[in-house]
From Swiss-Prot:
GO terms for biological process: fatty acid biosynthetic process; malonyl-CoA biosynthetic process. This is Acetyl-coenzyme A carboxylase carboxyl transferase subunit alpha. Component of the acetyl coenzyme A carboxylase (ACC) complex. First, biotin carboxylase catalyzes the carboxylation of biotin on its carrier protein (BCCP) and then the CO(2) group is transferred by the carboxyltransferase to acetyl-CoA to form malonyl-CoA. Its main location: cytoplasm. Residues 39-293 form the CoA carboxyltransferase C-terminal domain. PANTHER family: ACETYL-COENZYME A CARBOXYLASE CARBOXYL TRANSFERASE SUBUNIT ALPHA, ACETYL-COENZYME A CARBOXYLASE CARBOXYL TRANSFERASE SUBUNIT ALPHA, CHLOROPLASTIC. Pathway: Lipid metabolism; malonyl-CoA biosynthesis; malonyl-CoA from acetyl-CoA: step 1/1. It holds the Pfam family ACCA.
Amino acid sequence: MASQYQLEFEKPVFELEQKIQELADIAGDNVELKTEVVKLEKKVDKMREVIFANLSRWQMVQVARHIDRPFTLDYLTHIFTDFVELHGDRLFGDDHAIVGGMAKLDGEPVMVIGHQKGRDTKEKVYRNFGMPNPEGYRKALRLMEMAERFRMPIITFVDTPGAYPGIGAEERGQAEAIARNLREMAALTVPIIVVITGEGGSGGALAIAVGDRVLMLEYSIYAVISPEGCAAILWSDGTKGAQAAEALKLTAPDLKELDVIDEIVKEPLGGAHRDHETMAKNLHEALARHLKELKALSVEQLVEGRYQKFRKMSRFAE
């Protein structure tokens, strides 16, 4: 699917694509024009390849936030079957910023949980812009505990700017809900695979991201704070997001080098927003492969491996 939403650095490509479309519309049976269209299409692919091979960290932030990137429900449609959504935390309410339920991956029952954003204004408000309240994290934990009870592997999709910072969320125990999830996920005895699909925003992301394997899509980001938030704190200037992005080391290659993640999942040329099906196919292969490896481990190996994985992240160099 070709997105109509343009990123600034993609404009030369979009302009050429418009010219190609105009040529194609008038080409008819004209062989010369058809040949020219084919040449220009190859040129577009080459331009996009060069652009995306040289993205700055700030440009990757923009791609990760692209409104047409696939969200959790899109992956559920393309990768899983027999999805049954489960609602509510049994304490306060149902948070629409987190979706989850039972599904099948290649015929095997799994529990799928993920952040869910919206695309139009109505849906964005309904999903609270992908920022969960405490009841969202408590719903996620309820489903994880259910998965453990029924011995179902857990797969989570992370894509959030962060946990919702509203007064109501704080009154209902936002910090406690996140902290409890971190503690409980670390001790679960079933395989957990985490996928960072877009924005991995601080504790709001980590609350469903303690896993045996952590995968990141090629142009996703994962950090302790947004670049704009970091810039506002360090330099009292939120417009210095590009500078902060460089300092945060928030891209998939950065985090693979630091051993924070286990694998970078290749995106289609131009990003996941351009081709949901190919992105889902690539991710499906990675999920199936990692799940097979994790199922071969004993419970003791799973829990100890997960513990050691997160313990070694606190390295620093002088």
